[in-house]
Swiss-Prot record:
InterPro entries to which the protein is assigned, alphabetical: Amidohydro-rel, Metal-dep_hydrolase_composite, Metal_Hydrolase, Urease_alpha_N_dom, Urease_alpha_subunit, Urease_AS, Urease_asu, Urease_asu_c
Stored Gene3D superfamilies: Metal-dependent hydrolases, Urease, subunit C, domain 1
UniProt protein name: Urease subunit alpha
Gene: ureC
Record lineage: Bacteria, Bacillati, Bacillota, Bacilli, Bacillales
Pathway annotation: Nitrogen metabolism; urea degradation; CO(2) and NH(3) from urea (urease route): step 1/1
């Protein structure tokens, strides 16, 4: 006979189900479950007296050789991804996601997609949220400790450039030349995250660019501090087209070599990743923002100006001066910094993100941005925009799924698509590396409970190692076994160009990590940006800097209070 329980009883045992809503942190956002893969009454749960025991939800006969037997099951998780908000079990094998569905023992249970056997471990996710590991595509590799800070925020992939604390690295996300690229590929062997490095994109001799792609760069960065001229940009794009890599552009703030229109004329119809498209991080003043209307531009913006608050403008001048090696005693340097900080375009940035005109969010780490705040600031923007603009079309009370899917895509699948790594990472889908972040809903967007990297727990909140239980204070982030021994190399990927991959860069440098080629980049357009592909007409008033979308002035009010802030950081 069947057993009936109340909704509250069910939720406390197995987590929310279809129609239930979860508040994300202390924001005003609610995720509503669209589908539950569980068979009611046959949910697989672990623990004393629970169902995952021998002969029950754990199959006693099968071995690991069965392709449907998981190494790890994340049970009863609420999965939030760019295309779904569902309740499901996640099956992981050999470090990769192989199934999303219902886990258990098919001998006695119905509709089992994932077999739990004697070789299977369990992460209990009842009442928890699971997301794909985040991808930050604007990283200045200045300090190796950035990787740990980012990991503890839910970021599992870094793309950018640098060689350490050099002036070039502090300013330009560039790893210049084969020697530096090889050294950074070797250094990545000791990092607990996936990485890809961008070379320097300034050269009229294509050989100087090609040798960097051959050395393993996944693309080229054209930056104004090295000279973002139309000529340099065009040459870099020529090489990118030949080798199927991405170009990242920090355009010409001073308009020395041309205006925004000249840059777009040099680009033609070729795809590129436009960094900090709002312009405070750099780029044609005051109208770089107009580039987001082009179908071949994949626009991102960076977290120092997100969301717009009453402190944003004041803090930026000093950041620009330090990052770009400017001299406060030189009036022209002060004018350069001032030209980038425009409250009107900053106020429009949040709205453009909310409309899906800007497709991605990244950090600009230690070069005006904060490497551990990409995810937090993304959800703060989403909260502010719901507060100011109301629900998105299709959303309603206690269901912000459309907005949630739009915003999570900005730091997961869209960066992966942009840089040619979406075959490997960027979403919770079968066939992808199991880079998975587990959140208590109360702490969503701020502090993950644990991070699974390549199928193994890499970082987790855990108590005193001498405690009698794992929750003995002090509870803090601690390295897990995914960061020890050979696991550092067996659970993370290093991304390289296809030509470097085919020529055996892993063997040439004796790399132990999983080395994978970037691919399918040059045919991209903004239409490929999930939930963030809008291309309206954009204009900027050259006198007032006001931003217009299809003729309508857009702006936002400076926030004086935000969620996901001080109540989460008392200690």
């Amino acid at each position: 006979m069947s057993f009936k329980m109340t909704q509250n009883q069910y939720t406390s045992l197995y987590g929310p189900t279809v129609g239930d809503s979860i508040r994300l942190g202390d924001t005003n956002l609610f995720a509503q479950i669209e589908k539950d893969y569980a068979v009611y009454g046959e949910e697989a749960t672990f623990g004393g007296g629970k169902s995952i025991r021998d002969g029950m939800a754990q199959n006693p006969r099968v071995t690991r050789d069965d392709v449907n037997v998981a190494d790890l099951v994340i049970s009863n998780a609420v999965i939030i991804d760019y295309d779904k908000v569902v309740k499901a079990d996640i099956g992981i094998k050999n470090g990769y996601i192989f199934a999303i569905g219902n886990a258990g023992n098919p001998d006695i249970m119905d509709n089992v997609d994932i077999i739990i056997g004697s070789t299977t471990d369990i992460i209990a996710a009842e009442g928890k949220i699971v997301t794909a590991g985040g991808i930050d595509t604007h990283v200045h590799f200045i300090n190796p400790e950035q990787a740990e800070v980012a990991l503890e925020s839910g970021i599992t992939t870094h793309i950018g450039g640098g060689t350490g604390a050099s002036e070039g690295s502090k300013a330009t996300t560039v790893t210049p030349g084969p020697w530096h690229i090889h050294r950074m590929l070797e250094a990545a062997e000791g990092l607990p995250i996936n990485v890809g490095f961008t070379g320097k994109g300034q050269a009229t001799n294509p050989t100087a660019l090609i040798e960097q792609i051959n050395a393993g760069a996944i693309g080229l960065k054209v930056h104004e501090d090295w000279g973002a001229t139309p000529s340099a940009l065009s040459h870099a794009l020529d090489v990118a087209d030949e080798f199927d890599v991405q170009i990242a552009l920090h355009a010409d703030t001073l308009n020395e070599a041309g205006f925004m229109e000249d840059t777009m004329a040099a680009v033609k119809d070729r795809v590129l990743h436009m960094y900090h498209t709002e312009g405070a991080g750099g780029g044609h003043a005051p109208d770089l923002i107009k580039s987001a209307a082009f179908s071949n531009i994949l626009p991102s913006s960076t977290n120092p100006t997100l969301p717009y608050t009453h402190n944003t403008v004041d803090e930026h001048l000093d950041m620009v001066m330090i990052t770009h090696h400017l001299n406060a005693a030189i009036p022209e340097d002060i004018a350069f910094a001032d030209s980038r900080i425009r409250k009107e375009t900053i106020a429009a940035e949040d709205v453009l993100q909310d409309m899906g005109v800007f497709s991605m969010i990244s950090s600009d780490s230690q070069a005006m941005g904060r490497v551990g705040e990409v995810i937090t600031r993304t959800w703060q923007v989403a909260h502010r925009m719901k507060e100011q603009r109301g629900p998105l079309d299709g959303d309603f009370e206690h269901n912000d799924n459309n907005r949630i899917k739009r915003y999570i895509a900005k730091y997961t699948i869209n960066p992966a698509i942009t840089h040619g790594i979406s075959e490997y990472v960027g979403s919770i889908e079968p066939g992808k590396l199991a880079d998975i972040v587990l959140w208590d809903p109360i702490f969503f967007g701020v502090k993950p409970e644990l991070v699974v990297k390549g199928g193994l727990i890499n970082s987790a909140v855990n108590g005193d190692a001498n405690g009698s239980i794992p929750t003995s204070e002090p509870m803090k982030y601690r390295k897990m076994y995914g960061q020890y021994g050979g696991n550092l190399t067996s659970t993370s990927m290093t991304f390289v160009s296809k030509t470097a991959y085919e020529n055996g860069i892993n063997r040439a440098l004796n790399l132990k990590r999983m080395v994978r080629p970037v691919k399918n980049i040059r045919q991209l357009s903004k239409a490929d940006m999930k939930n963030n592909s809008a291309t309206p007409k954009l204009d900027v008033d050259p006198q007032t800097y006001e931003v217009y979308v299809d003729g309508e002035n857009i702006t936002s009010n400076a926030a004086t209070e935000l969620p996901l802030t001080q109540r989460y950081f008392l200690f």
